[in-house]
Structures are given as structure tokens and as C-alpha cells.
Amino acid sequence: MDKLSLKNKDWKYFYLSDFFDFEKGNQNNMASLSTGTLPLVSAKKTDNGYKGFVSKEQKKVFRGEILTLNNDGDGGAGIAYYQPTSMALDSHVSALIPKSNLNKYHLLFVSMCITKQRKRFGHGYSINSNRLRAFKIMLPLGADYANPDWQFMEEYMRRKETLLLKPAVEKLCKRLIHKEILGGG
């Protein structure tokens, strides 16, 4: 039996607001933004929501290690992304700021659980502050059957990361070795 199988866990609904504070992005005049080094996250369905890089001047800067949630957008409504670095958010995106110490792997797992529900949202039914407060996600239960199993979520996402990265790392190593043997390295 695979101890990291999602099917082998008991699950329970939790409110997003149990674990996150919410803050809506405030960049709404995209044409006036000057180019810089601060990532700008918009309601895109690709590229982790990154639209470009803007100047930090007079911008609300959100810290990294949070989730962003597309409120509406180009088919991306309901998609959640883990954001590792500081960023600016456009007005079609909400920041989900952890209330407690959630790490990268916890946030990746929760973003996956949120995104699984994205079909509920779209231009006719966007995410707003009331819907965010009422938003529930299913999470695996810990041994106490009351709280989420954060350790399981971390181990599950670490394994996923390893499985996804391993082929790319092996390919890169082969290229580097090949380049070293044939010269030019």
C-alpha cells in the first residue's frame, strides 16, 4: 500500500479562511506601469500568472511564499498559483496570505486543491470577497481526524517534485557529461 496515495486518506472540507487572509490586488492601469524588476501577476491561465515586470515605485508589494488566486480572467478564473518571490498583483487577482507557517509544499498542495474547483468560476461568476470567505477545499485529515495532515501534503508534493524533475536533471547531466567528453566544456 502506497502511504502517499490520495485514495488512502480521509478528507474533510475546510474554509480557505481557516488558513489564509485575503487581499485583492490593486494594479488596474496596466498601460501606466513602467518596466522594472518586480514580477506582476495577472489573471492568466499560464506562466504562474506572470504578465511582466514592473517598477516597484508606488506599487503595493506582496511578499513571496503566498498563493495567488485568479478572480476572473482569460479562462484562468479559479486557478491558484504558488508565488515564491515578492510581486505586484493586478486587480483581477487575490493574494492568499498564510495565517500560520505553511511551507512551499503545503502551499503547492493547497493550490492544487483550489484549482481543482476552477470550473465553478468564470466571467459570469467571478471570485469576490464574499465567495472567498465561503470557499471550501477538501484536505487530507491527520491522525486526530480534525486537522489537515500537513506532513502528508508536504511528503506528497516532495515526491511529485522529484518525479517531475528527475528526468530533466538526468537529461541535463547527460548533456554536460557529453559536452565534457567531446570538449567545448
Name these PLM-found stretches.
Residues 1-26, 34-48, 143-185:
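Non-catalytic DNA-recognition/assembly elements of restriction-modification systems
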Residues 31, 72, 104, 112, ...:
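A conserved ligand/cofactor-binding region detector
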Residues 53-56, 122-128, 163-174:
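Short, tandemly repeated low-complexity microdomains enriched for cysteine and small residues
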Residues 53-112:
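A short beta-sheet element
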Residues 87-93, 124-143:
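A short glycine-rich beta-alpha junction/loop motif
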